[in-house]
A protein has these predicted regions:
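Active-site phosphate-binding strand-loop segment of PLP-dependent enzymes
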Residues: 114-171, 183
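A glycine-/small-polar-enriched, mobile loop at the entrance of the PLP active site in fold-type I
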Residues: 4-60, 64
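PLP-dependent enzyme catalytic core of the Aspartate aminotransferase-like
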Residues: 333, 337-398
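Active-site C-terminal subdomain of aminotransferase-like
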Residues: 14-15, 191-282
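Conserved active-site segment immediately N-terminal to the catalytic lysine
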Residues: 177-189
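Conserved beta-loop-alpha segment that forms the PLP phosphate-binding cup at the N-terminus of a helix
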Residues: 53-82, 86, 90-93
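Conserved PLP-binding catalytic core of the aspartate aminotransferase-like
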Residues: 290-322
Length: 398
């Protein structure tokens, strides 16, 4: 029987067909006027996609590479930093900061939850040089209130730099960047609908000034080199030219979502993720399943607890073997306990209805229990119908 492979993971995500075509067709050398023009357009468009006037960098790297750069460029060994950690990727910030000799203090929250601002307030002392946090903790499906965190950090003065990993946040959540966030990081394989291999960030003037005095070793991820090259429409080292061409196509697609306005297109993309998230949560609850981050759900993905007595790996295998659907397991301490369905980037409402219909079949097979077929799809359809009738899609916790 024919079975297509479909990605429902929070990265990589499905690739935009126009981006596939652009990547296949582009074969220009990176030290040419053609590529400089392309790269300059991408940098300018990313400003609108992020929502910033800050300088933007694009590097051939995973998102973790630019996360590392946000530590090595902004700290020196011995600096005191705060890491807000509520999952696998918060733990990664702590590991990176320790690798560069920082004195790390952690503001923690349980997996699937978000932070108490009072905990951050108590630890945000004047000697803290930087705060590192995720916008969306994709290992748990939780979304953190970056605006509230940023206002608290900025309210403590100019000494503390705020760095936000928004790799699954950009394109799924609205951010107020300028004046609040010093470094915000994104990745190509998320809402931007192209393969892994590019990471990007916007950097404030405060952060650029900090780099003049920090002493951590850096070479490939020296942001100052990248900024100097970007001013010429280049990268300091060989860029991933085909991926840049794909990124340009994806940004143009988003612009057309907004009828020629990229900022409006970004808003449409975010609304699309919000709607899919609401549909997915309603569908899961329609089957009696428990959401993992119910108080702070992300728009990028939905984390769902495996039914009692069922290991989530069995659910994931059944999704793949029966339908060709690739769904993500939990990570860290939640591996085997939950599964994650993504809906950021190149997903639409039909994708959402399809994965929920598949979920009904998967649960019946894996648990051996009676499933009311249509329950998940019906619940999601009701959300979709309300949206089509003009009801606003309420934003989940930001």
């Amino acid at each position: 029987m024919l079975r297509k492979t479909r990605l429902f993971t929070p990265g990589p995500t499905p690739i935009l067909p126009a981006a596939q075509t652009a990547m296949a067709a582009y074969a220009m050398h990176h030290r040419t006027a053609d590529f400089r023009g392309l790269f300059s357009r991408v940098l300018a468009d990313l400003k609108d996609f992020i929502g910033t006037n800050h300088d933007v960098l694009v590097l051939a790297s995973s998102g973790t590479g630019v996360m590392e750069g946000a530590v090595s460029n902004l700290t020196s060994a011995g600096d005191k930093v705060l890491v807000l950690s509520a999952g696998k990727f918060g733990e990664r910030w702590a590991d990176l900061a320790k690798a560069f000799g920082c004195s790390v203090e952690i503001v923690s929250a349980p997996y699937g939850e978000t932070f108490e601002l009072d905990d951050l307030r108590q630890k945000l002392r004047p000697e803290v040089s930087a705060v590192y946090v995720q916008a969306t903790e994709s290992s748990t499906g939780a979304r953190h209130d970056i605006q509230a965190i940023a206002q608290l950090v900025r309210g403590r003065g100019d000494n503390t730099i705020l760095v936000v990993d928004a790799i699954t946040g950009l394109g799924t959540t609205h951010f107020g960047v300028d004046g609040l966030i010093d470094v915000i990081i994104g990745g190509s394989q998320k809402a931007l609908m192209i393969p892994p291999g590019l990471a990007y960030c916007a950097i404030s003037e405060r952060a650029w000034k900090r780099m003049e005095t920090t002493r951590s070793p850096r070479y490939y991820f020296d942001f100052r080199k990248a900024r100097k090259a970007a001013a010429r429409g280049e990268s300091p080292y060989t860029p991933a030219t085909s991926l840049v061409a794909g990124l340009a196509a994806a940004l143009e697609f988003i612009r057309q979502m907004g009828d020629g306005d990229l900022i409006r297109g970004r808003q449409e993309l975010i609304e699309n993720a919000e709607l899919a998230a609401r549909m997915t949560r309603a569908g899961a609850e329609g089957l009696g399943l428990r959401l993992f981050a119910p108080s702070c759900p992300a728009a990028a993905l939905t984390a769902i607890q495996a039914p009692s007595g069922t290991e989530s790996g069995a659910i994931i295998r059944e999704f793949h073997d029966r339908f060709g659907a690739v769904v993500a397991n939990g990570q860290g301490e939640m591996k085997g306990k939950l599964f994650r369905i993504a809906h950021l980037g190149y997903y639409d409402s039909l994708d959402t209805l399809a994965i929920l219909a598949a979920l009904e079949q998967v649960l019946a097979q894996v648990t051996g229990r009676a499933v009311k077929y249509g329950a998940a799809v019906r619940a999601a359809q009701e959300v979709y119908s309300q949206y089509r009738q003009g009801a606003n899609v309420p934003a989940t916790a930001r």
